[in-house]
């Protein structure tokens, strides 16, 4: 059996966000092969996410964040976010509370409009399509390319407007969806954003 070092376990855990016991088992079961262990964890993670998706997230907390442009002035931007989990035990953990704080600060900075793409009204998407189509024609794009250009821009609108599809402001390589999946894998529960509100005096 290949010798598994503490450094290997630590490195794989940092790369995947998986728990210590899962990381060790992945390395042992794959004879210390790093790439195979990563694939094993990815497959295991997918299975765990699928199982968690069927469970109910009936606990959690509401986190708030207030932003001041000047420490001497009252806050002009505020966020409330509802972060849900399955048990009050997880809701009380510092990791869960920190995740809620990170999400509230992300929402303040990134200004999403919806939690999921399914929440975007059809009329909003149709209005965006018309705007992008008119813009593409004004730009003189070839007629046969306009439909593809419009869909690409609509997809860009969705990614920028939907919280789960946005890149995390603290790490642009990770989406909020992936961040929640990592937290769910680490905490062993279904983690989801229920809803959020963002208030900005300057946009009122």
UniProtKB/Swiss-Prot annotation:
Gene Ontology CC: one annotated term: cytoplasm
SUPFAM superfamilies: Elongation factor Ts (EF-Ts), dimerisation domain, UBA-like
Predominant cellular place of this UniProt entry's protein: cytoplasm
Involved in Mg(2+) ion dislocation from EF-Tu: region residues: 87-90
Protein location: Cytoplasm
Pfam families according to UniProt: EF_TS (PF00889)
Function: Associates with the EF-Tu.GDP complex and induces the exchange of GDP to GTP. It remains bound to the aminoacyl-tRNA.EF-Tu.GTP complex up to the GTP hydrolysis stage on the ribosome.
Family: Belongs to the EF-Ts family.
Protein name in the entry: Elongation factor Ts
Source organism (scientific name): Frankia casuarinae (strain DSM 45818 / CECT 9043 / HFP020203 / CcI3)
Lineage: Bacteria, Bacillati, Actinomycetota, Actinomycetes, Frankiales
């Amino acid at each position: 059996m290949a010798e598994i070092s503490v450094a290997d376990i630590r490195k794989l855990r940092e790369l995947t966000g998986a728990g210590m016991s899962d990381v060790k088992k992945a390395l042992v079961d794959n004879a210390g092969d790093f790439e195979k262990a990563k694939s094993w964890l990815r497959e295991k993670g997918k299975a765990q996410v699928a199982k968690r998706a069927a469970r109910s997230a009936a606990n959690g907390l509401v986190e708030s964040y207030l932003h001041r442009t000047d420490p001497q002035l009252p806050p002009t931007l505020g966020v409330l976010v509802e972060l849900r989990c399955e048990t009050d035990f997880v809701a009380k953990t510092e990791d869960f509370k920190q995740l809620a704080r990170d999400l509230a600060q992300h929402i303040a900075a990134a200004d999403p409009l919806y939690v999921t793409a399914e929440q975007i009204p059809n009329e909003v998407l149709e209005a965006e399509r018309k705007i992008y189509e008119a813009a593409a024609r004004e730009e003189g794009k070839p007629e046969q390319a306009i439909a593809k250009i419009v869909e690409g821009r609509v997809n860009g609108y969705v990614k920028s407007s939907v919280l789960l599809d946005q890149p995390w402001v603290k790490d642009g390589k990770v989406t909020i969806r992936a961040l929640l999946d990592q937290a769910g894998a680490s905490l062993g529960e279904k983690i989801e954003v229920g809803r959020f509100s963002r208030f900005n005096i300057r946009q009122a």
